[in-house]
Amino acid sequence: LRFDVSPLWLGLGVLFLACGPGRGDEPCDAACPEGDVACRERSCADTTDEAARAAKDCSEMPAGGRCLGTRVVEWCELGVFLREDCEPGATCVEEGGVARCAEGTACVEGVTRCSGGGWELCTDGRWQSRECAAGCVEANGRGWCGEPGSTLSGIVRYARRGPDAAFRGWTPEAELVPAGGFLVASYRDESLVDLGVTDAEGRFTVRVPDGVAEEDRIVVYAAGRGSGTTVTYAVADPALSGEHRVPAVPGASARIWSWSRSRRSLVERPVFTIHESEGSGAAAVFDALRVAWRQSRERYGRTGLPVVAWLGFGTTWSCGACFSATPVTAAGRRWEAQVWLPGDTDAAWWSEAMVLHELGHWVMSSHGTTPNEGGPHYIGVPTFPGQAWSEGWATWFSADSRGSSRYYDRQGGTMFWVDLEARKPSLGMWSRPKPGEGLLQRIEENEVAAILYRLGRGTASRQPLYEALAAPAMNASPWARGYLRHRWRMENGKVVDVRETEDPAPCLADFLDALMCQGFPRSVMDAATEPAVAYPYPSHAPLCR
């Protein structure tokens, strides 16, 4: 659920991150070169529990390290267990007994190639060999098992906008960007001839019938397949108009967003451009959806719930933008989760930050447990712990997926932003928690996101944060900190009719416990929470199950 822009601003000013304690007043990482995160982790792993965890992990570690999934390298150095995330475009490879990040090895799910005489398919984000008795044949950049016959190649791109340099509106001119990871189908009349996928640069090659016919066409779909052959995530037009209360029943003609061109036009000029007037905003949403799907798979080694994102131009929703793990059968298949995105004049579909925020809720629902504590919430206004945890995680996931600390959106004709690194909003003041009000105090969701952002930046890998979300302690009710879900409503910008239920719910403190119980460095935790002046999390005494 998006937060609302509100004139009710609360805050204590901006407080900045400081290093954890060392000897006396000296930070624990004082001797480390700037940017040397591995040195910081060695120097600041200052508790018996952390050392014991490292010793256990290192006793099982191959001498040259190992890959954890596609994007994380694990190794031990001087008895300290370390992890590092590979940069975008790189994957973890194990060669000659050594695990490392290799540049240029990432690929788009479903793309094929010929390599070393063999046929390879991109599976789970990396190239995997496949049996091919007929021999691999390369045609226009795509690998085929055997001769493919007649093919057509091209490139797909779409028009998109983003925030302008001042973050006051969308860019006045759209730019054309590659449409990577989109499904591409070749048809003769209604008969499917071939189905492929665009690579990271938007390039595709598909089989076509011999001889060009007027009924031949190429269709690009805003849809993706997981590791199988079934479409598992897509952007769809709900075939509705006006405002609707969620969860809304899609119209009978609801369909996955697609764009069609004649084969003949692409033979003459093999560039498939999706323009704004054709709904390129849906293509932009799919780009964000694909990023979230890939991030989820890389971090957890498994796919999330099959999800559809509803975007209809001129269609709005009672929640603004929101997510729910509510199943629906529509647009040709059953989906286990839905995202509703507004199609009004704010053109918020251009906000990759907002779309990925909603998909952060999808990640939590797919791999963790949601607090199910919903309701209106406003920038700068502390809310209840369950909602703050859910919304804060979603905003952090958006930041992590984009590699940016700045969240941005447009509502009611107003563009606004929040910077997690600086703890600074574009409007009003930042609200900080108070150490005297305990772990279950109301807390502003962006403060939760800022804490998570610092936790992620304090180590060379964000993998511990994703693992903590899926930890058994975060998925077993009741939760250790004892928080109970609340219900309330808003009246004139104020919380009224607050009611505590008997339903347990997870909150930020439970998540921090899960992190610490897995051996997370105390110094990094304290630097993020600042317990003496802000959130009073006791890193020395986590509740472990």
What would you call each of these model-derived segments?
Residues 353-370, 391-395, 399:
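Active-site recognition of the HExxH zinc-binding catalytic motif
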Residues 159-189:
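Short, ordered, surface-exposed loop/turn motifs in non-cytosolic proteins
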